[in-house]
């Protein structure tokens, strides 16, 4: 089965691959990341905007690569002083959704994000890292790598897969 991931971010792709392989150990998947627009600002600043970005990514991936088995949209955002992400999975018949855990951000980080910077760029500046958003993410930095962007996204993706694990109940 072909799974299209509406992102080329390695951390997001790894999370999707892991979640699908754990949820469906007897199935064989091929995964492809595709670069598509979210249709929202680079740094979404509300829950609604973030969720819309994930859905827009799926819709744009369907246009770019039609007739695949699953489409997965992931979008990270900020609301208040926390960051989180929406996961949406669509197979044309069923849609599964889940929001990740929320991660509190330091006030200095929030101040810079409110000036229009992306969270990943701010984290790189303040923690002297390079392209952290494609690695462990802010989550990895702030939890001393007890959690990573991939591990937190994997959990949320498994929750979004529940309707596909129990299709007769949804």
Curated annotation (Swiss-Prot):
GO terms for molecular function: ITPase activity; metal ion binding; nucleotide binding; ribonucleoside triphosphate phosphatase activity. Coiled coil: none annotated. InterPro entries: ITPase-like_fam, Non_canon_purine_NTPase, NTPase/PRRC1, YjjX_NTPase. It catalyses: XTP + H2O = XDP + phosphate + H(+); ITP + H2O = IDP + phosphate + H(+). GO terms for biological process: nucleotide metabolic process; thiamine metabolic process. It is an enzyme of class 3 (hydrolase). HAMAP family: Non_canon_purine_NTPase_YjjX. PANTHER family: NON-CANONICAL PURINE NTP PHOSPHATASE_PRRC1 DOMAIN-CONTAINING PROTEIN (PTHR34699:SF2), PTHR34699. Belongs to the YjjX NTPase family. This is Inosine/xanthosine triphosphatase. It comes from Aliivibrio fischeri (strain ATCC 700601 / ES114). The lineage of its organism: Bacteria, Pseudomonadati, Pseudomonadota, Gammaproteobacteria, Vibrionales.
């Amino acid at each position: 089965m072909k799974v299209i991931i509406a992102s080329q971010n390695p951390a997001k792709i790894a999370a999707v691959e892991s979640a699908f392989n754990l949820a469906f150990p007897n199935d064989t998947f091929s995964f492809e990341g595709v670069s598509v627009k979210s249709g929202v600002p680079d740094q979404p600043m509300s829950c609604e905007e973030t969720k819309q970005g994930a859905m827009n990514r799926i819709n744009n991936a369907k246009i770019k690569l039609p007739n695949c088995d699953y489409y997965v949209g992931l979008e990270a955002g900020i609301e208040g002083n926390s960051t989180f992400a929406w996961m949406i999975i669509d197979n044309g018949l069923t849609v599964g959704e889940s929001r990740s855990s929320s991660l509190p951000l330091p006030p200095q980080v929030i101040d810079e994000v409110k000036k229009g910077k992306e969270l990943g760029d701010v984290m790189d500046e303040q923690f002297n890292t390079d392209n952290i958003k494609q690695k462990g993410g802010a989550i990895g930095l702030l939890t001393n790598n007890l959690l990573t962007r991939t591990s937190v996204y994997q959990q949320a993706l498994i929750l979004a897969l529940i309707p596909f694990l129990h299709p007769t109940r949804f």
